[in-house]
A protein has these predicted regions:
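Glycine-rich beta-alpha loop elements in corrinoid/cobalamin-binding modules
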Residues: 6, 28-166
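A structural signal for short coil/turn segments at secondary-structure junctions
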Residues: 2, 36, 61-62, 91, ...
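A short, glycine/small-residue-rich beta-strand->loop->alpha-helix junction that serves as a flexible
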Residues: 14-23, 72-77, 197
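Radical SAM [4Fe-4S] cluster-binding motif and immediate context
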Residues: 173-334
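Conserved beta-strand positions
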Residues: 9, 69, 98, 121, ...
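Residues at alpha-helix caps and immediate loop-helix transition turns in enzyme cores, especially N-
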Residues: 20-24, 51-54, 79-83, 225, ...
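A short, flexible N-terminal coil/short beta segment enriched in small residues
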Residues: 2-23, 31, 35
Length: 335
């Protein structure tokens, strides 16, 4: 086994064909690869291997230090518990690590129910490196920030890890480990070419608001630089033929200056791409809409949530019904 460690990530099956690229796992893989770690990816959701087939292909005849599974809470009982049962049967000396939006808020429950070893709470790029070093060096798990872990049927919570402030310091996702042809061609785009290769990316993390229904654990918004975003787009277009991008940001169109600077950079570099993104009605105006359209934006998603002001106030949206109407009007008029 690689002295710097060996990690397997399993992208569990969601029993559908239009699978979104697993961006979170791809970031973790990139960080580990940069450290010289051997990383393998099992894309169960793309190839629809049964748990038994997955075990034959990835677990029975191989050994790992960590086996990671990310998930949404809605998939836990239906999919993850059975998957973890299979992993535990064949994992040998590996630690079974859970992460994602499903694991972070209810780590105690998921660790006990799935009989996993560790749950990463919050962002995982720094935590996964520390966790692997802890495993291969046989160090104390209680010293690893940003995790909960199970020991003797008890769950222990360590100190929370602070979010990564400089997003440009995170390497681009490790696309080379994934079946990019499948991921880039299975999702319908809103672009002029419905068969254009499409992929998702993140230009920021977080949001300026704190709606009371939001799953986010951190406060505020952190931004990548425009140059860094443009370089990723160029790389994806050059290496994988991607021409349509879905911006996964909770709030892409903020601040206004960065949004316009991004649009200007797309135009200046003659990228000839199309994209869709999310916006808030209270920080959206006609000038922004014009630049977005010129840069290739084909679809804007506003979180209107309700046409009743009382409901918006209860949600703590900090927006008004009139702002919803005005934003929709501007977007339609600009086209």
């Amino acid at each position: 086994m690689n002295k710097k460690g060996k990690v397997l990530f399993i992208i569990h099956d969601v029993y559908q064909e239009d699978n979104e690229f697993p961006l979170g796992i791809a970031y973790l893989a990139a960080v580990l690869k940069k450290q010289g770690v051997e990383v393998k990816i099992c894309c169960q959701e793309v190839f629809h291997w049964s748990n038994k087939e997955m075990a034959e292909l990835f677990l029975k005849n191989d050994e790992y230090d960590l086996i990671g599974v990310g998930f949404l809470a809605a998939r836990f009982k239906k999919t993850i518990v059975d998957l973890c049962e299979t992993i535990n049967k064949y994992k040998k000396d590996a630690w079974l690590v859970l992460g994602g939006q499903g694991a972070s808020p209810i780590a105690d429950y998921v660790l006990k129910t799935a009989k996993a070893d560790v749950a990463i709470i919050g962002e995982g790029e720094e935590t996964i490196v520390d966790l692997l070093n802890c495993k291969i060096s046989d160090k104390d798990l209680s010293k690893v920030k940003g995790i909960a872990y199970r020991e003797d049927e008890k769950v222990f919570f360590n100190e929370r890890r602070k979010p990564i402030m400089n997003l440009d310091s995170i390497p681009f996702p490790e696309w080379s480990l994934f079946p990019m042809e499948r991921y880039s061609s299975c999702i319908y785009s809103f672009g002029s070419d419905k068969k254009a290769k499409r992929i998702g990316m993140l230009s920021s993390r977080g949001c300026i608001n704190r709606c009371n229904f939001c799953y986010r654990m951190e406060h505020g918004i952190r931004l990548r630089s425009v140059d860094n975003i443009i370089e990723e787009i160029k790389t994806l277009k050059r290496d994988y033929g991607i021409t349509y991008f879905t911006m996964y940001d909770e709030l892409f169109c903020f601040p206004k200056k960065r949004t316009i600077d991004f649009c200007k950079a797309v135009i200046k570099n003659n990228l000839n791409i199309e994209f869709d993104c999310n916006a808030r009605v209270d920080v959206f105006d006609r000038e922004t809409a014009v630049y977005l359209k010129e840069a290739g934006c084909k679809f804007l998603n506003f979180g209107f949530e309700s046409s009743d002001q009382k409901v918006l106030d209860l949600m703590k949206k900090n927006t008004t019904v009139q702002e919803n109407i005005e934003a929709a009007k501007i977007a339609n008029e600009v086209g």
